[in-house]
Amino acid sequence: MNTPRKAVALISGGLDSMLAARVMLEQGIHVEGINFFTGFCVEGHTHAIRRQDRAKPKRNNALWVAEQLGIRLHIVDVIEPYKDVVINPKHGYGQNLNPCLDCKGFMVGQARAWMEEHGFDFIITGEVIGQRPMSQRKQTMPIVARESGAFDRLLRPLCAKLLPETLPEREGWVDRARLYDFNGRSRKPQQALAARFGFTDWAQPAGGCCFLTDPNYSHKLADLWQARGTKLYELDDIMLLKVGRHLRPRPHFKLIVAREDGENNFLLGYRRQFAHLEPLSHGGPLVLVDGVLQDGDLELVARILGRYSQGREAPAVTVRYTPLAGPAQDLTVPPLPVQELPVEWHL
């Protein structure tokens, strides 16, 4: 009996990667999934932190897809090597700070290394020609195959008939006639194929599975880079950009203000890394200070905290400021009126 050929499938948690893997399973290929953790993934982070919508069930879509397909899923931490993709994208950014083409090449390259290390034969993705304006155009697909080092061991089952034959097709491991020619942004072909396979539920991650496609998040990341004078970042930096209100009242410091109890509890874990303020006289949020306060800044920050506390209508609130070094200091200040909180401060 012939040993089945083995493919590693990039599993995002969306419909396309689920279908691509299922098409290969239908042809008798042994498939295992791989999912990469970059630190910018939307899934699960803010849901785990915020109480809002906590009652709604939340799943890890990549794990869920693997379960539906009956395949193993390998989740790989690529936070460190991925930094160069974000900081220095060879092919530039998309509409926001999303380096989509470089990202796809990086992911396929990581899958190629995994494939070689584990004795697999080829790589599959759920890409569809014309589905994404930057990374899934017919002109860019050869770039991904070449720059990742996967070359013709990269098979895209959903649009393979529109592309040159790959090694798995030429060698007869995969029947090209049973692959597909999906093209464009319409989801109807995928939905029809999902119905044939009996799939009735799937996630809709699309670009939304990465915070770098989000304009608000990208604006906050660009602000962080500008304020620090470098694009270097750590995981804590990009996690904190997902949490709270971010305000920059002055160029030399930024405030991170918790919006509710879940965020407050999360930010408590950073009290030893940031100067911070907390209300004493009224209920209210923890505020982290990212930067160094100068003369006159502390009163302003205390008044901003008062604005977001339950004492916003009171004549005065008392707050405690704890610097990174030195004793804590209590201040009593009038809360900042809303008209004195410029929209431009909000990131």
List the predicted regions and their residue ranges.
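AMP-forming adenylation/ATP pyrophosphatase catalytic core
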Residues: 147, 151-347
